[in-house]
């Protein structure tokens, strides 16, 4: 690894340890030329699968779209940003763990609904009403009844 101070190629690792619950390696390095020390972090780069939309189009996974949809459902609900971030990271890990290069947007929608069901029941109903395109109050009521029987 190149030294960020003098750009020398020859550096050595002084110390290594796992961080971020074992998902990263923190390395303390020293330059053999200028003797400066610096820290690097190493992690596996796992790409998100592409999405196959309902009309057949393919597009890259978009974190912003995911967060906008989730935040809209959770608007004015008592859920902390930390809980939202943890749930989104879990959802993204689940998608990466499929090992697939492409997944349908339907799978992502179902995962978001499960995520919201665990965070806030009202947010779940809000999201489900848009995602499932309820046609009338009866469908809305059926989803609420299903939610009540689950708990």
UniProtKB/Swiss-Prot annotation:
- Mention one GO molecular function: DNA binding
Is Secreted included in the keywords of this UniProt record? no
Q: What ranges of residues constitute the unnamed zinc fingers?
A: 3-34
Keywords, alphabetical: ATP-binding, DNA-binding, Metal-binding, Nucleotide-binding, Repressor, Transcription, Transcription regulation, Zinc, Zinc-finger
- Reported cofactor(s): Zn(2+)
Keyword Transmembrane found: no
Q: Which domain of life is it from?
A: Bacteria
Q: Name one Pfam family in it.
A: Zn_ribbon_NrdR
Tell me the GO BP annotations in alphabetical order.
negative regulation of DNA-templated transcription
Any note on cofactor binding?
A: Binds 1 zinc ion.
Question: Where would one find the signal peptide in this protein?
Answer: none
Annotated ATP-cone domain ranges read 49-139
Q: Which family does it belong to?
A: Belongs to the NrdR family.
Cross-referenced HAMAP family: NrdR
What is the purpose of this protein? Negatively regulates transcription of bacterial ribonucleotide reductase nrd genes and operons by binding to NrdR-boxes.
Task: Name the PANTHER family on file.
Answer: TRANSCRIPTIONAL REPRESSOR NRDR
This protein is called Transcriptional repressor NrdR
């Amino acid at each position: 690894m190149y030294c960020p101070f003098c750009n020398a190629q020859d550096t050595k690792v002084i110390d290594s340890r796992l961080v971020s619950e074992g998902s990263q390696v923190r390395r303390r390095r020293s330059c053999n030329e200028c003797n400066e020390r610096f820290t690097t972090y190493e992690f596996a780069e796992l790409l998100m699968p592409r999405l196959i939309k309902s009309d057949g189009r393919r597009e890259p996974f978009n974190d912003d779209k995911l967060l906008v949809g989730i935040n809209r459902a959770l608007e004015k609900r008592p859920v902390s940003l930390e809980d939202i971030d943890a749930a989104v990271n879990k959802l993204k890990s689940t998608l990466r763990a499929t090992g697939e290069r492409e997944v349908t947007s339907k799978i992502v929608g179902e995962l978001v609904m499960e995520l919201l069901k665990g965070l806030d029941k009202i947010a779940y109903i809000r999201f489900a009403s848009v995602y499932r395109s309820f046609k009338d109050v009866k469908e809305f009521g059926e989803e609420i009844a299903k939610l009540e029987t689950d708990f």
